[in-house]
Amino acid sequence: MLLRRTVGLIVTSGLAAALLAPTTPAVAAVTSGAVFNNPTVASQQYAIVEHVQRLIQGAASGSTIRVAMYHFTLTRVSNDLSAAYDRGVHVRVVVDSQSRSYPAVTGLIAKLGTNRAAASWVTVCTTDRACIGNLNTPIMHNKFFLFSDTLGSTNVLVQSSANLTNDNAERYWNNAVTIVGNTAVYNSYVTYHGDLAAQVKNNDYYRTTSSGTAKSYFFPRAGTTQDTDTIYNMLNENVTCEGNTSTGTETGRTIIRIGMWHFSRNPIATKLRELADQKCWVEVVYTETDTDVRNILSGHDRIKLYQITGDYIVHSKYMLIEGTYDGQKDTKWAVTGSHNYSNAALRENDEALLRIQSATIHDQYRSNFWALRDAAVPVS
C-alpha cells in the first residue's frame, strides 16, 4: 500500500510539474510567400527587415547564410549575422564597393574576415565596378539572402528589392519573396553568389535555371537589340491577351501590372503598347521614367500610368501577369528582383530576377500593387 501510494504521489507531482512548467512556443515554419513594407505606416516600415532578421536568428549551427547586398547600413542586421557566426553558423557576405566604409560592413569584416578559404567571410566588389559586370560603371545591385537551414526549413531563398538601409524601410515601397525547398533554383543562387565572390569579370554572364514553379535569371546580359532583353522576351514570346475564363478582366483579358523604380527600356514599353492594342490591360506604377517610355505608353485606353513621388517612392521592381502566359490560360505569375527596367540593369550590373508561377504569391503582389496605385498620382 505504501509503495502504491508513493508511486501515485510521484506520478501526480510529475504531472503537476509538467502542467506548471513554462512551454516553449512553437517555431513558425518558413513558408513560400511575399512580404512588403509600407513606408507610410510606422509599424509596417521594417516588415522586410524583420522577416530577414527572423531567418538569420533561426539559422541552425553548422548551416550557411549567404548575403548579396548593394547598400548595407543596418547594424541591427549585421549584429544578427555576427551573433549567428558566434553560434556556429557560416556567414558569407558580398557587398558593393559603395558599402565598404559603412559601420555595418566594417564591423562584419572585423568579425568574419575576408579570407574566402575560411567558412565565413565578407567580400567587397571592385571599386567603381560590379563583382562580375565590367562595362562602363556597373554596380553589384543584388539584394538576396540564402539560408541552408533555418527554423526547421532547408534551402530558403529570399529575393528582395530592398537594400539594408533605413530609407529603404522608412521612405521606399519594397518587396521580398521567399521560396522554400526549390533545390535547383536555390542552388543556382548559391552558384551565382560564389561567382560574385570570385569576381571574375564577365559582361555576358547571363544564366537561367528553371525548376517547378520558379525560374532564376542572373545578369549582366550582353547584346544591343531587343531579342536579348529578358523582360521584352517574356512579354513578346509568352503573353497573349484573350481566352481567360477565371482570371484577368471581366471579359477574360490578360492583365499586366508593373511596379517599378526606374523604367527606361523602349522595347518593353513598345511591347506593352502592342499588347494593349491586342486588348490586354496594362497598369504601371513608377517613380522614374524617361520621356520616350512615357510617350510610348501614354494616350492608350487600356494603359494606365501612375507615379509616386515626394517623400515616399516605389523602389520595387516587379511585373505581374494575370491571364495567359506561356500558352497557359487562367494562370498567375510574378517576376521580381533587383532588376530595374533600365539598360544598366540589363547590360552592366550584377542583378538577379525571379519568375514565379503562383496564384497565392501573385495575389499578394496584386494587393501590394493596389496599395501603390492608391498612393500614386494618375499620369494618364
Label each residue range with its predicted role.
Residues 267:
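Active-site-proximal helices and loops of the catalytic beta/alpha 8
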